[in-house]
């Protein structure tokens, strides 16, 4: 066992403070990673504050991890010491259910093991995430980071990136299609970048007129102000696919008339109950509402390679580990464009 400096929350109403956790000695299939950067996700805040009622304290958040290989288990032959690698939202799964057999570990029928606040099958203990100096992970769940990507900007790709890439890829977004990205935040800004890189006409859909300029800077071909009823009416039936990144409950069916016949809106932002469903725009257009989590390991590697080919990273603000509590406050006030990334290498010793 080795120790790792980290920051942890010890109660729902306490700030994150310096802490230490133990990491297992790398096994034959393990990779020991020195963490350079870790993105900050809204999920981190939810777990730190026990918003979902299942946090195990102390908790060390962080599932957008980029670092370099410190040590390798004897069976790991395709990585080398010093290589830049990444770890995303989960570090284990059952490996044998139909989902895992089809490279969709995120939908493991036994439940995947989250990178933090999960139960390690091998050790029977709680997993600790990337707000930490180092981590030990099974090779299967370690990803290769293209050499041309900025490592800090690449960190949010492990959650915000794959959360938006996976549904766009699954629903076949390509040139000749029109895609609407609803909401401009950590997820929405990645949705714009990916949809545009896939060749689709990309429209940012927002209630905030002041976000229009930034949406176009990120690559949006157009901006639809959803509070402009006349403009919305003109766009009815024009979209092949809607990527809904709004993080809070809302009337999802209010957007459905924007879709073409057989169009799909995929929800990736808001988890849990929402307003009552009006089925009329679905039935009178054979439209669909769907949801998507993150991607499996194979697809996440594909996404990273796609980002390398298209020079895609997240728009970020780098912070020190010691500033994490203030960063949480700013995130809750929507005061970041568009993801915070912790410089672990320069913050923890």
What are these regions (language model features)?
Residues 2-4, 253, 297-349:
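C-terminal hydrophobic helical "lid"/dimerization subdomain
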Residues 24-38, 51-101, 106, 128, ...:
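Glycine-rich beta-strand-centered segment in the early N-terminal region that forms part
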Residues 84, 178, 263-264, 288:
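Short glycine-centered segments of the SAM/dcSAM-binding site in methyltransferase folds
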Residues 94-182:
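NAD(P)H dinucleotide-binding glycine-rich loop of Rossmann-like/cofactor-binding domains
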Residues 175-184, 196-254:
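Adenosine-nucleotide cofactor-binding segment
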Residues 188-189:
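N-terminal Rossmann-fold NAD(P) dinucleotide-binding loop
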Residues 259-260:
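Helix-to-beta-strand junctions that scaffold the AdoMet/dcAdoMet cofactor pocket
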Residues 264-266, 277-317:
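Rossmann-fold dehydrogenase core element
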């Amino acid at each position: 066992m080795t120790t790792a400096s980290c920051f942890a929350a010890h109660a729902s109403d306490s700030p994150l403070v310096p802490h230490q956790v133990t990491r297992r000695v790398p096994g034959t299939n393990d990779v020991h990673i020195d963490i350079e950067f870790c993105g900050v996700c809204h999920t981190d805040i939810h777990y730190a504050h026990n918003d979902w009622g299942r946090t195990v304290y102390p908790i060390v958040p962080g599932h957008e991890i980029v670092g370099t290989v410190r040590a390798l288990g004897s069976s790991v032959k395709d990585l080398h010491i010093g290589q830049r690698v990444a770890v995303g939202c989960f570090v284990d799964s059952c490996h044998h259910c139909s989902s895992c057999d089809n490279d969709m570990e995120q939908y493991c029928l036994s439940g995947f093991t989250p990178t933090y606040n999960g139960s390690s099958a091998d050790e029977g203990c709680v997993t600790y995430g990337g707000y930490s100096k180092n981590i030990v992970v099974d090779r299967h769940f370690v990803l290769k980071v293209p050499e041309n990507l900025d490592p800090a900007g690449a960190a949010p790709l492990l959650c915000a990136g794959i959360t938006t890439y996976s549904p766009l890829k699954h629903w076949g977004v390509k040139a000749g299609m029109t895609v609407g990205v609803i909401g401009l935040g950590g997820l929405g800004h990645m949705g714009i970048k990916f949809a545009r890189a896939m060749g689709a006409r990309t429209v940012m859909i927002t209630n905030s007129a002041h976000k229009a300029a930034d949406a176009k800077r990120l690559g949006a071909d157009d901006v639809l102000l959803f509070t402009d009823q006349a403009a919305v009416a003109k766009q009815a039936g024009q979209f092949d696919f809607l990527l809904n990144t709004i993080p809070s409950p809302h009337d999802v069916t209010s957007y459905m008339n924007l879709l073409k016949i057989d169009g799909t809106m995929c929800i990736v932002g808001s988890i849990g109950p929402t307003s009552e469903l009006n089925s009329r725009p679905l039935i009178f257009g054979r439209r669909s509402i769907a949801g998507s989590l993150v991607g499996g390991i194979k697809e996440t590697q594909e996404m990273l390679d796609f980002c390398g080919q298209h020079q895609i990273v997240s728009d970020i603000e780098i912070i020190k580990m010691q500033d994490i509590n203030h960063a949480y406050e700013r995130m809750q006030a929507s005061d970041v464009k568009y993801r915070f990334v912790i410089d672990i290498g320069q913050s923890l010793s």
